[in-house]
Amino acid sequence: MVRILGILSLALLAATLLGGCAKAPKMTNTGFLSTYDNLEKVSENRTKYMSGDFVAKYHKVIINRVQVLVHSEKPIMTAQERDDVINYFQAALERVMTNAGFEVVTEPGPDTARLRVAITDIQKSSFWGNLHPGSKLMGAGTGGASMEGEILDSVTGRQLGAVIQAKKGSQFDLEYFDGLDDVKDAINAWAKQASKTFESMRAKPESG
């Protein structure tokens, strides 16, 4: 018993020293966006741009398939995990846009926007950081993700909105271990933020 407690204590100490101040993945500039000139810094982990006329003039949206642009010497995910993350993000985007009042379509048009999103970095949760609940609460072993996304006029290609952001996962999900849980937590946080942005824009009175 003493030996087991000693091992757990060492694991917790290692978690504290190696990952106690877990940070979000780095934001990237991969060239995925059509332009980066419109972006303005919001925080250390977020830059964004949104055209004032987007909500008023566009009522439909084409949602391109989410891309994964993660470059690593060693594979970060299996093919199944990759598909799982893409499908999870795709479903989240469709919910956000539908709830915001946009009709999801497949053909370009004058009142139709195009949404493009890419995951540009992924940090899977590490098993050693989940050996003890205390280590997870301190951020050890916490994963996350970063992304780039933009909304374009589906006909002209004009950028209507864009964002680059990074997010680490939840430190409080202690029920079970899944290396992609924190990536999905990041996706959920981005979806929630996007929903708030659209709600705020629709709440503003139209000018003129």
Residue map of PLM features:
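Bacterial N-terminal signal peptides that target proteins for export
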Residues: 1-9
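C-terminal motif of bacterial Sec signal peptides marking the signal peptidase cleavage site
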Residues: 17-20
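A structural "domain/chain start" motif
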Residues: 22-87, 198-208
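Second-shell loop/turn segments in exported
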Residues: 73-84, 103-104, 173-181
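Extracytoplasmic/secreted envelope proteins and their assembly/folding machinery
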Residues: 86, 90, 94, 101, ...
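Surface-exposed short loop/turn segments
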Residues: 95, 99-158, 169-176
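Compositionally biased, intrinsically disordered linkers/stalks adjacent to structured regions
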Residues: 167, 175-208
